[in-house]
């Protein structure tokens, strides 16, 4: 028998009191411990090698949250003088090596690691750069400290980038990585941590002494962490791996003496390998942000993109559902796998002068240690003084403020139109191309805002049509395509979501955020037909959005469209109608790989 929304909501209070209290208490204890660390005297100094690419702010915030003083590397001499050195690599391999070479940091970095007497930790690209080289960027030499070449993931059915929460198979004893403690059969399996990368290093006979852990994704396990004495590096991002990641940083910085507790008992429904292991399906909390009529930045939510209150048919104030920074922290504590900020009036604002949005990112990154995405206004623009800014400059400002990914909406539609007009070729100047070339494809999310466009005959449009079984047209039409819109859904264009997604993947985007204007705020579940059509068209991750009204809607879209990597909701979380935990419990009961 199907559970109604009223039945579900009537049981929520009991569910929360019995099932959420322990989780809330654990998170409160962790937060109290972190606040105490940050407030106490410094535990010591750690040097940070920030070469100016991507979001390094979160690494800095994590170490400061743990009670350490962070010193920036400003010269080659600073590397050799460092007591502890953290090297968070972000972006493309070639760009990173070019910057290190220009700043004359390659040789001192090699000397520091080869010496091995002082602690070193590389993160993500900071691990890859330790190898001989990479096939990325047309083939580039690395630091040559670990034997092997970094190569791209392969496999016809593999979704690349590898984005999300996965487990490590730990090969030998180390204080760096915690294991799952609640299942004896998982004695060598770590808690889930956050990965985002398209290239990986493979274990071989020449580097086996370095390999601390591997991760399964694709045709063969790749190296997820290395350690030799005081030298350590991870392919995953500890600073984006919640309390588990903070514990890893604390273990590194304290030499294995961390007292943080991160493991929690998983429910019996999560005991199967299918739930515990493998790349987890992600639950993303989205905050639609805009200024209200008083000029305050608020989180809002609408129906079919209309965010104003209604009173006797008239438009009222912007619907206010809370403060962005507070809600982001709330969702992190609840277990959201990512948090997304969408500035829904960004298409008409001047992004680099949007100080409140920049401040939201900076403040959120101090307390939210999962990936942050920001969207709205990522485009080239000229301000009122005639000064021109590129989309790359806009994205760079967001990355420097704490964002891990940028979401591009209206500009992507116009870029795709030019792409098809130019015989399916990019010109190298678009926002998608310039940002992905600098920061990597994983940093670029394409937000598609389509609505159903019905046709009596699929031949009436150049765009891909489907025969719909979900909802017929107003005159009984059984064919439809999904028309892309710009300007917050106000203007439709003659290009479909299918065509847009294909163009964006070819131009270098790393992820698709697939909204649906027809289902926005309706609570009827995600549009499986739309999600399947786009997920089948590309080999990059697809995020389902718009329509969630019940925890089962998340399980249903993942079951109906196995290629769907994540699902996103906003209003149901803001109004406390559904919690992130409830969605994940339902996913685990359905046997889906879930981070709990």
For each predicted feature, which ranges?
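N-terminal chloroplast transit peptides
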Residues: 1-22
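Amide-donor transfer/coupling interface in amidating biosynthetic enzymes
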Residues: 33, 37-42, 79, 112-115, ...
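Cysteine-nucleophile active-site neighborhood
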Residues: 84, 90-166
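Hydrophobic faces of well-ordered beta-strands that scaffold small-molecule active sites
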Residues: 234, 281-289, 339-341, 372-376, ...
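Conserved N-terminal beta1-alpha1 strand-loop-helix module at the mouth
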Residues: 266-367, 423-430, 434, 438-446, ...
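Active-site beta->alpha loop and helix N-cap motifs at the rims of alpha/beta catalytic domains
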Residues: 332, 336-338, 342-412
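Glycine-rich phosphate-binding active-site loops on the catalytic face of alpha/beta enzymes
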Residues: 343-346, 392-424, 516-521, 544-582
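Catalytic cores of alpha/beta
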Residues: 368-402, 454, 529-566
């Amino acid at each position: 028998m199907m559970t109604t929304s009223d039945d579900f909501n009537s049981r929520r209070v009991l569910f929360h009191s019995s099932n959420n209290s322990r989780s809330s208490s654990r998170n409160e204890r962790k937060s109290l411990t972190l606040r105490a660390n940050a407030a106490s005297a410094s535990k010591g100094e750690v040097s940070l090698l920030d070469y100016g690419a991507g979001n390094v702010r979160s690494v800095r915030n994590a170490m400061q949250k743990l009670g350490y003083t962070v010193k920036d590397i400003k010269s080659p001499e600073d590397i050799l003088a460092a007591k502890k050195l953290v090297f968070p690599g972000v972006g493309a391999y070639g760009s990173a090596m070019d910057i290190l070479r220009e700043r004359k940091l390659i040789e001192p970095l090699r000397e520091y690691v080869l010496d091995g007497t002082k602690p070193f930790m590389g993160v993500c690209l900071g691990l890859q750069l330790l190898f001989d080289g990479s096939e990325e960027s047309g083939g580039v030499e690395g630091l040559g400290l670990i034997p092997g070449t970094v190569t791209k993931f392969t496999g016809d059915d593999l979704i690349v980038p590898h984005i999300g929460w996965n487990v490590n198979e730990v090969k030998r004893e180390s204080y760096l990585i915690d294991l799952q403690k609640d299942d004896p059969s998982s004695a060598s399996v770590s808690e889930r941590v956050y990965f985002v990368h398209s290239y990986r290093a493979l274990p071989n006979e020449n580097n086996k002494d370095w390999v601390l852990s591997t991760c399964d994704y694709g045709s063969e396990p790749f190296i997820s962490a290395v350690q030799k004495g005081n030298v350590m590096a991870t392919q995953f991002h500890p600073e984006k791996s919640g309390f588990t990641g903070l514990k890893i940083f604390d273990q590194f910085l304290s030499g294995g003496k961390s007292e943080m507790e991160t493991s929690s008992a998983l429910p019996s429904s999560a005991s199967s390998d299918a739930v515990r292991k493998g790349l987890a399906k992600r639950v993303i909390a989205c905050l639609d942000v805009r200024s209200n009529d008083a000029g305050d930045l608020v989180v809002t939510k609408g129906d079919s993109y209309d965010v104003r209150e209604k009173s006797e048919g008239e438009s009222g104030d912007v619907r206010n559902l809370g403060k962005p920074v507070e809600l982001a922290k709330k969702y992190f504590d609840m277990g959201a796998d990512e948090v997304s900020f969408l500035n829904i009036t960004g298409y008409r604002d001047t992004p680099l002068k949007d100080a409140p949005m920049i401040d939201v990112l900076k403040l959120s990154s101090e307390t939210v240690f999962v990936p942050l995405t920001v969207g709205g206004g990522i485009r080239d623009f000229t301000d009122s003084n005639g000064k021109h800014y590129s989309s790359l400059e806009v994205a760079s400002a967001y990355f420097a403020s704490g964002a891990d990914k940028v979401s591009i909406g209206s500009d992507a539609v116009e870029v795709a139109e030019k792409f098809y007009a130019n015989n399916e070729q990019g010109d190298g100047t678009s926002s998608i191309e310039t940002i992905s070339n600098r920061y990597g494809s994983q940093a670029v999310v394409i937000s598609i805002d389509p609505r159903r466009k019905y046709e009596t005959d699929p031949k009436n449009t150049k765009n891909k049509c489907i025969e719909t079984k979900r909802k017929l047209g107003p005159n009984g039409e059984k064919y439809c395509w999904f028309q892309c819109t710009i300007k917050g859904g106000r203007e439709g264009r003659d290009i479909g979501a299918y065509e847009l997604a294909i163009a964006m993947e070819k131009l270098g985007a790393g992820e698709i955020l697939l909204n649906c204007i027809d289902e926005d705020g309706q609570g009827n579940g995600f549009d499986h037909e739309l999600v399947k059509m786009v997920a089948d068209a590309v080999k990059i991750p697809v995020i389902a959005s718009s329509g969630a009204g019940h925890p089962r809607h998340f399980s249903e879209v993942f079951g109906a469209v196995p290629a769907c990597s994540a699902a996103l909701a906003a209003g149901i979380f803001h109004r406390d109608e559904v919690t992130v935990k409830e969605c994940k419990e339902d996913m685990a009961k359905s046997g889906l790989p879930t981070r709990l």
